């Protein structure tokens, strides 16, 4: 796994995470719809996800960046938590907002470790802004370990993505 490929894989996976968890923050003026008393935005309005209109299609798309079973687990959790809803042939994502300083932070790929048998671990340093600070002065840095291996198609994919939990 070359560094440039690892960076590209992490960037794509992180962008997908932003799409699924921070859609409300980046709505671009789109008006939410109310489904079952909760506000949602159509996932199809989110750029590169514009041809995805079902949870199954999203799982297939995620399979380029995440192991199939892990992608399925993430989407199942999103549907269960009502962050993701299929309605009238359209896939909607919750119009959620997050704490004011949670958007301010960054990351850096520090290291690629061999884990044996064609598996790797990306060591990524994540940092977050201090509470209420929007000037990019970071209060905490944390190393997070992301396991990577090849899928059946021979593509490197994440078998877990701890950023999903720690960055929320």
Question: What positions do the PLM features span?
Answer:
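Core segments of small alpha/beta cavity-forming domains
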Residues: 1-93
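Short beta-strand edge/turn micro-motifs at domain boundaries
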Residues: 121, 139-168
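Short, cysteine-centered beta-strand-loop-beta hairpins and adjacent loop/turn segments enriched
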Residues: 127-141
């Amino acid at each position: 796994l070359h560094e440039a490929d690892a960076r590209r894989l992490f960037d794509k996976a992180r962008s997908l995470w932003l799409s699924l968890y921070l859609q409300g923050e980046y709505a671009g003026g789109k008006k939410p719809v109310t489904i079952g008393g909760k506000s949602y935005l159509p996932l199809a309005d989110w750029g590169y996800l514009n041809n995805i209109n079902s949870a199954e299609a999203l799982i297939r798309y995620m399979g380029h960046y995440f192991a199939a079973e892990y992608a399925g687990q993430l989407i199942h959790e999103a549907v269960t938590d009502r962050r993701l809803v299929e309605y009238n042939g359209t896939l909607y994502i919750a119009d959620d907002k997050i704490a004011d300083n949670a958007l301010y932070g960054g990351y850096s790929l520090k290291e690629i470790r061999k884990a044996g048998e064609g598996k790797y671990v990306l060591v990524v340093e994540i940092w977050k802004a201090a509470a209420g600070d929007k000037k990019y002065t970071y209060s905490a840095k944390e190393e997070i370990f992301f396991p990577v291996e090849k899928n059946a198609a021979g593509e490197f994919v994440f078998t877990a993505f701890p950023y999903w939990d720690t960055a929320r």
